[in-house]
Each structure stands twice: as C-alpha cells, then as structure tokens.
C-alpha cells in the first residue's frame, strides 16, 4: 500500500493522543510452542526462553490454550518468571474449540489471574474466512462467560479479564466486521509490510498507515479513545526468499525494528513482535514459505540476532 499523506496526518493526530496517555508503548513477543525437533515445549523449555526475553519484555502471546499443552506448561513458567500471557483461544473447529475451553477450565485455576494479560479468541479468523463476524462475536461472548466462572489458585475470579480478538488490519477496517469490534473488550491489529512487498524505504510508512487505519476504525466503532490496543503481529524475516520488493535479511530486520517497531512504540502504541525465536521445525514447501522459519529476533538456540534497543530520547 502506498503511504497516504492524508492518513499520515490523521495518524499523527491519533498517535499524539496515544502518546499523551501512555508515553512509550509496551513491547511483547509472540511465542512458538514447539522445539526444533517438533516436540512440544515443556515448562522448563518455556522458563529458558522467558529468561532470555526478560531483559526486553515481561509479556508474551500464544495462539491457543490446548495445542501442545500450551497453557498447562507455559502458565507455571510465566508465573515463576514474572511474565504475563495473552492467552489465545482457537475458535475452530468444534472439537478444537471444546478442547480450548477445557484447557482454560483445567489450567487457569492452577495459576494466579495476574499471570493472564487477557484472552484472544481467534487469530486472523476473519482474514482466513474461518468464521463470520457474527460467529466470532458469539465465540468471544462465550469465552467471556466461560472465564467468568473460573477462579485462580488464590480463589480470585477471572471475570475482570479482557476478552477480545486479533486480526489483520485490513479486515478490521472493513465495515462488515464491526460486530467483532463491538463484542471485544480489546482488539489487536496485525500488519506486515514484508507481506505487502514493500521496499525498506517504504516499509515503516506502510506499517504506520495500516495500523492507524485500524486504530481509527476501532476507536470510532467503540466510541472511545480510552481502549486497550496492541499491534498483534509485526516483524521482518532474517532469511529466506524475497516477496516482491521485500527482502529478508538481518540488516533489514534491524532497520524495520528501529524505523517501524521502535517508532510505533515511541508514539505510545503497544507492539507484539512476531516473533521471539526462530522456528526451525517449520517445513519448507514452496514459494516464499522458507521465510517462516526466520522471523525470530532470537535464533532457535536463543542467540540475539540484532540489537533490540530503541532510542526514545
């Protein structure tokens, strides 16, 4: 997408409001759930990864509660390391969704409610046409009802936790999905300049443009600027096949970190980066799929690829 001067002006105004409220946006990371050999991560594996991330964040996001026993194994690790989790709930298919709710009911009582940052029902479910806006709204309301009946290890209720969703910025700005925004306590927007084939010269502009379009629609739909908002996924791969004018490399990932992620946070917008660690277990198939292994800011062996410092002066 080309950068729009009109939208840039609107974005600046919206960002100014955000920056007044929250100063520097928070940083978090999406976290994979499998080891290099494809086995599911244990509590010990998660503890090791969270220790590597601790210098940069205290919040992670996962896509599902039951897959690979994620909540069962990550919950205790996060609690031990002082992290909070955005817990994903996969809303399709029916058997998977039932397993997700069962995982919440079984493992949320074993940790403190302060370990949970919020619940995200679906991840780009609208973008993939997995669910209609009405169907996803119903699932969001259902999960809200489920967690309201669960108490933590100290007997505190999860009823006050926010329940929302995360989806691609472009489907959030589509008017026919407003029911999902209305049903959600909070909404996250994903935006990848890489998958739009942007040059490095335009990547950060495209990122800002996309996110601010989404934020503007979310604020308008909710009728308030006093809402929780995060970039749910963004980043740049460090290896693999180029996509149009977007080239994966460590230098380009570092540049996008500085010009896109750091700048977005400087305007007071919270950002969850995709992703924390490379996922070597992911298979190569065809086209540009080989980049899927290389989105981590850390290698799969926990080595930092480039500086994550931001200059907020």
From Swiss-Prot:
Top-level taxon of the source organism: Eukaryota
Primary site of residence: secreted
Group of enzyme by EC: hydrolase
Catalyzed reactions per annotation: Successive hydrolysis of beta-D-glucose units from the non-reducing ends of (1->3)-beta-D-glucans, releasing alpha-glucose
Glycosylation site positions: 202, 284
Enzyme nomenclature, EC number: 3.2.1.58
Catalytic residues (UniProt): 124 (proton donor), 233 (nucleophile)
Gene Ontology CC terms, in alphabetical order: cell surface; extracellular region; fungal-type cell wall; fungal-type vacuole
InterPro entries membership: Beta-glucan_modifiers (IPR050732), Glyco_hydro_17 (IPR000490), Glycoside_hydrolase_SF (IPR017853)
Coiled-coil portions: none
GO molecular function, one term: glucan exo-1,3-beta-glucosidase activity
Residues annotated as signal peptide: 1-23
An individual GO BP term: fungal-type cell wall organization
Protein location: Secreted, Cell wall
Alphabetical keyword list: Cell wall, Cell wall biogenesis/degradation, Chitin-binding, Glycoprotein, Glycosidase, Hydrolase, Secreted, Signal
Family of this protein: Belongs to the glycosyl hydrolase 17 family.
Its biological purpose: Glucanases possibly play a role in cell expansion during growth, in cell-cell fusion during mating, and in spore release during sporulation. This enzyme may be involved in beta-glucan degradation and also function biosynthetically as a transglycosylase.
Note: This protein strongly binds to glucan and chitin.
Protein name stated in the entry: Glucan 1,3-beta-glucosidase
Originating organism: Saccharomyces cerevisiae (strain ATCC 204508 / S288c)
Gene encoding the protein: BGL2
């Amino acid at each position: 997408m080309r950068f729009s001067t009109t939208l840039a002006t609107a974005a600046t105004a919206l960002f100014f409001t955000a920056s007044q409220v929250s100063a520097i946006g928070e940083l978090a990371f999406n976290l994979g759930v499998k080891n290099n050999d494809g086995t599911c991560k244990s509590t010990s594996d998660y503890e090791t990864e969270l220790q590597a991330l601790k210098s940069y964040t205290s919040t992670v996001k996962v896509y599902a509660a039951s897959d690979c026993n994620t909540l069962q194994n990550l919950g205790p690790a996060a609690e031990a390391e002082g992290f909070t989790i955005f817990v994903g709930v996969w809303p399709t298919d029916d058997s998977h969704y039932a397993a997700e709710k069962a995982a919440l009911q079984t493992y949320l009582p074993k940790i403190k409610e302060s370990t949970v940052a919020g619940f995200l029902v679906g991840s780009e479910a609208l973008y993939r046409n997995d669910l209609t806006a009405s169907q996803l709204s119903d699932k969001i309301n259902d999960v809200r009802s489920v967690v309201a009946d669960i108490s933590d290890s100290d007997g505190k209720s999860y009823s006050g936790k926010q329940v929302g969703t995360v989806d691609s910025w472009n489907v959030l700005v589509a008017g026919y999905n407003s029911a999902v925004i209305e049903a959600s306590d909070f909404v996250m927007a994903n935006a990848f300049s890489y998958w739009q084939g942007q040059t490095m010269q335009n990547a950060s502009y495209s990122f800002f443009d996309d996110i601010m379009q989404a934020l503007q629609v979310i604020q308008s739909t909710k009728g308030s600027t006093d809402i929780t908002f995060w970039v749910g996924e963004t980043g740049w791969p460090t290896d693999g096949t180029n996509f149009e004018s977007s080239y994966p490399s460590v230098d380009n990932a570092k540049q996008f970190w500085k010009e896109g992620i750091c700048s977005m946070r400087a305007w007071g917008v919270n950002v969850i980066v995709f992703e924390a660690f490379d996922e070597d277990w992911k298979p190569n198939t065809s086209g540009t799929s080989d980049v899927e292994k290389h989105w981590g800011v850390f290698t799969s062996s926990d080595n930092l690829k480039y500086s994550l410092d931001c200059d907020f002066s």
